[in-house]
Amino acid sequence: MSVLVLLGLGGSAQETKKLSEADSNPRPTFAEADGVRLIDELRRALETENRGRFLKAFDAKRMPGYPAFRDQVADFFARYGEFQVRYHVTQTTMDGELGAEVADFEIDATPRDGVSPNVRKRVALRLVCGWDGKQWKVVDLSPRTWLE
């Protein structure tokens, strides 16, 4: 009988320890390395022409207008291929619980129709990022016109 009581107390202490560890484990600070990881993931997804991988970097629940954005991305991948991407991160900041990154972003793409000329777009791309409990994800992207 006393063994059962001791086991029960050990479980309670362990649960209390887990709760206090969770309370002392704050949301991580958004660092330049986090922003580079995200924008590089977008680059890899484009260069491998993997739309699903591209969209996985975004938080569909928190991103304003995500359904329209998802459709815009689908259209972009349908119209273009053979992407080459270059970027240079120029700014990384954190405002409250959100991180932000600005990068000079350049993309070359080949139209799939075989008739239209190749496209080169250059934009100052701004990513707003939020922590989803496991990793940073893009919760907003501007401008979105480079996907047109």
Predicted feature residues:
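Short solvent-exposed beta->alpha transition segments
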Residues: 30, 36, 51-94, 98
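A general alpha-helical scaffold signature found inside nucleotide-binding enzyme cores
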Residues: 37, 71, 120-124
